[in-house]
Amino acid sequence: MSRRTEIDVRPITEAEFPDWNRALNTGFLRPPAVAEEQLEARRNEFVPGRSLGAFDGDRCVATFRSFDQELTAVGGGLVRADAVSNVTVTATHRRRGLLTRMMAQDLAAAKERGDVVATLIAAEYRIYGRYGFGPATSMTEWAVDVPRAGLDPRWAAPEDGGRIDLVDGADVRRLGPELHERLRRAQPGAVSRTELWWRYRTGVIDWNGSPWTEPCYALYRSADGEVEGMASYRTDDRWGDAKQPLNTATVDWLLAVTPAAERALWHYLCSIDWVQTVKSGWRSPDDLLPHLLPDPRAARITTQADWLWVRILDVARALEARTYEGQGSVVLEVVDRGGLTGGRWRLEAGPDGASCAPTTESAHFVLDVGDLAALWLGDESAVRLAALGRVREERAGAARVVDALLRTSRRPWCPDMF
């Protein structure tokens, strides 16, 4: 067993990728060895300098990967993000500070590049707060009891003059990216997708080693013929003992840029013959789905959890990138144990724009950089955090001022796992 000081944390070379991938699979409790085809598919994600490994001798025992991403702020502003993924530490090498070393190295490089934030989807809640991340969006999954929903079983087409067609993977790759761009530029919390995302999700590339099964793809066009919505879903072909259909339609993803498209796609999914249950996939916690049904109680929440975590790397640029419905000012003291963006900042904000600059004035509101991340996209409440003792008012009423500036009328949402 090597001494802890001998474990080397560094960017991997392309030649080390197979060993890095073995360590990644081990950390995720998957079979360590994979077929050569799957390994080659995973190489598509390799970017020199952005995949880190911890090496005990010549064996990789921890993994970390990041890549360039854009995140949509409140109001539609796009900020540069360092997306963190593939974080593992082999069970034999835990509690040695390997993740801390990899995270520090990556965040320092992201700060140097000029990234405004870092992002990740946290597998475990208690890990990432220590690095300045905070839960900035959440997600909800619903299961719809179709017979109870109250929709007309004779439904055959959208009432608005639009239409729904079933398409194939080539159509999804052709039409999906532009549709997603329209959605994500209007949806705070949404992130950019690469061409690889679409190739992975339509079976062009085998990225997880499982046999590819083609899903169904439903496309919504408005009465004017414009593509405004798309969904990918699978059915399970399940029947009961009395020869009654008990099928479930599970949604992989659903994109809609208008309420009409969203309504039409959900109504279509809930009208498929033999389908008794529709599982929604990852949706916004204030998604319209339940209220698109005559009986909203037919949509039962099955999962509700934090989703996208954000680590602010530049307080001023992050706060200036978003819009504000209210008018006001507040002096924030941001505590950053990572030393990347702490300090005291005066935020002056209103509907016409915002400025955020360092100040020597007395603080009105003191908070950790992770809690600022939770507030930044508007999903969390400063008053709520104050009640929990996680933030501190230095001026009475400061939490209400922060909420008046940062809270939003619709909640942020990230549709993606990465």
Swiss-Prot record:
Acetyl-CoA binds at V87, T88, V89, R95, R96, G97, L98, L99, T100. PROSITE patterns: GNAT (PS51186). GO terms for biological process: aminoglycoside antibiotic catabolic process. One of its GO terms (molecular function) is aminoglycoside N-acetyltransferase activity. InterPro entries: Acetyltransf_17, Acetyltransferase_Eis, Acyl_CoA_acyltransferase, Eis_dom, GNAT_dom, NAcTrfase_Eis, SCP2_sterol-bd_dom_sf. Homohexamer; trimer of dimers. NCBIfam families: PRK01346.1-4. This is Uncharacterized N-acetyltransferase SCO4186. It comes from Streptomyces coelicolor (strain ATCC BAA-471 / A3(2) / M145). The lineage of its organism: Bacteria, Bacillati, Actinomycetota, Actinomycetes, Kitasatosporales.
